């Protein structure tokens, strides 16, 4: 299976999903089976609420598995990676960098914050998630301990 890394997705002015990676720039098509399979696996494992919603939306396509996977991946891309910018949507380590996509249904869509900017599946406790958030914000161990009223030792 293809590894997802250093990929930029964006929506063209014509409304097509475009891909920029080591192969160059091209339109995302159903024939991109390896990319679709890799993206689909990440969605299924790491974003189960988004996966469930996408499965419900494209339920009628399930009989044609490759097309079902493509439709789910295509929608996930459109809802999360719309801008062409200098920050890869999938970085060198395979981490997603979600973007705020210009969507006329923001706040009204029943899939808002489910498919777009989905919650990452983790077995971390709320306290552990808070530690990760503070670490991502650049806090040092001592500062995190201070904020959370904990001893470093």
Feature-to-residue mapping (PLM):
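Helix-turn-helix DNA-binding segment
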Residues: 117-153
């Amino acid at each position: 299976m293809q590894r997802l890394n250093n990929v930029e997705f964006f929506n063209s002015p014509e409304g097509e999903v475009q891909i920029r990676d080591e192969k160059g720039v091209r339109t995302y098509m159903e024939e991109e089976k390896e990319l679709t399979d890799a993206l689909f696996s990440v969605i299924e494992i790491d974003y189960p609420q988004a996966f469930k919603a996408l499965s419900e939306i494209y339920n009628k396509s399930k009989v044609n598995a490759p097309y079902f996977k493509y439709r789910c991946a295509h929608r996930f891309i459109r809802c999360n990676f719309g801008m062409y910018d200098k920050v890869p949507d999938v970085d060198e380590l395979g981490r997603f960098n979600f973007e705020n996509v210009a969507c006329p249904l923001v706040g009204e869509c029943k899939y808002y914050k489910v498919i777009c900017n989905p919650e990452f599946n983790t077995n971390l406790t709320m306290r552990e998630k808070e530690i990760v958030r503070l670490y991502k914000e650049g806090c040092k161990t001592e500062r995190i301990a201070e904020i959370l009223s904990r001893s470093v030792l």
